[in-house]
């Protein structure tokens, strides 16, 4: 379709509208991105969890990593089954629900591109949605990763069975509220910054440039999200590692307890391995997600 030009001038072509991809594209691309990220970054997740569960002064990240490699070897991948099982649906839900909420917000507000506040809002809503899916898997993963539980559980299914016998079905949802805080903060920070960072970067002229920009934007946004959500993640790990009633219950009171008893810095235990995982991990997520989205768009 073309618009009429002035006399003697050729008509100006009307740009074709950008076709929105179906929701299942976001589900597939997000799932593949999530599994890719967890396979590469999982050892740092184990170190992060062990540091968060330490009360008082503990090992540094490098000491923890060296000790884990020396003593555990491939057993450092203990607990990877729950995140692998949940990673595809979790990341699929992260990207698909963010896109869904973004469309709803844009439709309600009447604009075509999200403002930063709208991007934060859709990210927070996506994080809340994601939290309900991941919490049982997170609980099993935390208990398998905890150093003090090394001889307690023989496998993922053994942990599931013992948790169910001791705490019932509701036991798998321990830490739901702190998980909501963790995911809402990270997703709000991540999706809220991506568009801003991309617009600040030089416009790419090649496919390689697009990949580099996506990695930079995802990495910086992932780092910011990690800075926001680490206190909630610390108390979530402690809440979920407790069998039965314990010292830590709700997110905000538990954050205040940790800060009072161990100092403010304790709320950022495990931050270095976490940010080393989720900073580059955020870049991997965005690069793989957008790459798969393009592949799927090409097939249609």
Curated annotation (Swiss-Prot):
Transmembrane found in the keyword field: yes
Pfam assignment, any one: Mito_carr
TM ranges: 27-47, 74-93, 120-140, 171-191, 209-229, 278-298
Top-rank taxon: Eukaryota
Keywords linked to the UniProt accession: Antiport, Lipid transport, Membrane, Mitochondrion, Mitochondrion inner membrane, Repeat, Transmembrane, Transmembrane helix, Transport
Any one of the GO CC terms: mitochondrial inner membrane
Membrane topology note: Multi-pass membrane protein
The Solcar repeat ranges on this chain: 21-104, 114-200, 209-295
Principal location class: mitochondrion
Subcellular location: Mitochondrion inner membrane
GO BP term (any one): mitochondrial transport
Disulphide bonds in the chain: none
Keyword flag Phosphoprotein: no
GO molecular function: antiporter activity; dicarboxylic acid transmembrane transporter activity
Similarity comment: family membership: Belongs to the mitochondrial carrier (TC 2.A.29) family.
Protein name: Probable mitochondrial 2-oxodicarboxylate carrier
Organism listed in the record: Dictyostelium discoideum
């Amino acid at each position: 379709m073309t618009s009429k030009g002035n006399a003697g001038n050729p008509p100006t072509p009307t740009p074709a509208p950008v076709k929105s991809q179906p929701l299942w594209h976001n589900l597939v691309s997000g799932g593949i991105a999530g599994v890719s990220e967890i396979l590469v970054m999982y050892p740092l997740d184990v170190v992060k969890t062990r540091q968060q569960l330490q009360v008082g002064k503990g090992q540094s990240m490098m000491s923890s990593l060296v000790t884990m490699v020396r003593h555990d070897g491939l057993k450092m991948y203990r607990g990877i089954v729950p995140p692998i099982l949940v990673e595809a649906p979790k990341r699929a839900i992260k990207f698909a629900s963010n896109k869904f909420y973004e469309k709803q917000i844009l439709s309600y507000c009447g604009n075509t591109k999200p403002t930063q506040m709208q991007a934060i809002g859709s990210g927070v809503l996506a994080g809340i949605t994601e939290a309900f899916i991941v919490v049982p898997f997170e609980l099993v993963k935390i208990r398998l990763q905890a150093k003090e539980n090394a001889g307690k559980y023989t496998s993922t299914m053994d942990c599931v069975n013992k948790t169910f016998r001791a705490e019932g079905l509701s036991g798998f949802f321990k830490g739901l509220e702190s998980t909501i805080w963790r995911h809402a903060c990270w997703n709000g920070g991540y999706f809220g910054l991506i568009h801003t960072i991309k617009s600040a970067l030089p416009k790419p002229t090649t496919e390689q440039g697009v990949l580099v920009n996506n990695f930079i934007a995802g990495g910086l946004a992932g780092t910011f999200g990690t800075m926001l959500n680490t206190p909630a993640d610390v108390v979530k790990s402690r809440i979920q590692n407790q069998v039965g009633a314990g010292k830590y219950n709700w997110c905000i009171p538990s954050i205040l307890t940790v800060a009072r008893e161990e100092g403010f810095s304790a709320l950022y235990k495990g931050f270095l391995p976490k940010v080393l995982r989720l900073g580059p991990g955020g870049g991997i997520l965005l690069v793989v997600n957008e790459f798969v989205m393009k592949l799927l768009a090409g097939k249609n």
